[in-house]
Amino acid sequence: MLEVTDLYGNSEPLTNHSILENNFEINTVPDLNFTVYRKYNERAFDMITEKCVITEVESKEMYRIEMFSCIGSGDTIGYNVQCLHIVKDLNNKLLTSELKGSQTIKSCMDFIVSGTKFTYEILDSFSSFDFESLGNDFALNVLLNNILVNFKAEFEVTNYHIVIRKKIGIENAFIF
């Protein structure tokens, strides 16, 4: 089941939605796509707007609505909804300064999460990396395109908590 939380903090359950499509790939922002119809969700349906939070009730994972489009008409009006994981909120932080020289992965993570709701854990050891320049971009972009690449690390996320490892999961794992 899903729950929608509007920009004012009001929440309502979303029922009778389509089969969820979740995409999880290493070092990318997970997404969630679903279809929902007004006749089954009158109160919640009117709360759906861009940037609202959709929570998967079972896993408690939170996603932010990035885009939705209207489908059907009359009694069968609905929305196709596309969401990105709440970790996308890291891109609300513009890093206007830079780190230079030899940096640990911890100093880099401190740099990108400072002043945000995000926390992190580093579960493996990593050598320092010598940066010409790290920053002057959005925090999530720096994580995905610089920190993870240069430290040869992978991440997984549970809402506002990021876990950094050398390897997430096992190779040749079968995902249902």
Region spans (language model):
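A generic structural signal for short, solvent-exposed coil/turn residues
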Residues: E12, I26, D46, V57, ...
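Solvent-exposed, flexible loop/coil residues
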Residues: S18, L94, S133
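Ser/Thr- (and often Asn-) enriched beta-sheet segments in non-cytosolic proteins
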Residues: M1-T5, S11-P13, N33-T35, V53-T55, ...
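Amphipathic, non-transmembrane alpha-helical segments in extracytoplasmic/periplasmic proteins
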Residues: E25, N33-F34, C83, S97-Y120, ...
